[in-house]
Amino acid sequence: IYVTDERQQLHFKQVFAILRKMGVPLNLKHVWFGLMRLPNATFSTRQGNVIKLEVLLDEAEKRAMDIIQQSSTTLTPEQQREVARAVGIGAVKYADLSQNPQSLVTFTWEKAMSLEGNSAPYLQYAYARISSVLDKYRERFPQGDYTAFPLLLQEPVERRLAVHLLRFDDTVLAAARTYRPNYLADYCYALAQLYSTFYQNV
């Protein structure tokens, strides 16, 4: 698998065509991705208009730390740094992976760091809520709850959540077959939304 930006499409079509004409058995794939741009400019190495990943991740971590320190928190300074790092790096990765890879992506800090909508901080918050519920369950049932009982899905949101969970395997397979990690990101976002509705109403 060759992964490049969209500008290399013709090159790989020609290379693969030549190899086929030569009788070379091919098990090759070119996976291309669209360009990422800032709101006011496109990244260009030739023009020197690039931001190094290290600089981008440092800025993301700083912005996450600002958000953490503005909220009322009982975290120690070390915990704040750990959370800021996880949220910052997650925000940058998710902002990239949640997009259709073959589209033009405009990166904005507002969207990447948003606590609402399809963003890493939103998903990380949902994960923290789910983990909190599981922690309380483990406190109450340290050996596990071995009582067997039929599971009755009485609320519509319970059924929607259960059906969505059953789609996980198909989503992973579709993402792998099509080289589209955004399918999995979309699945996770929909799951977080369903869980939030379930948490609030059931």
Regions found by a protein language model. Give the residues of each.
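Non-catalytic interaction-recognition regions
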Residues: I1-V202
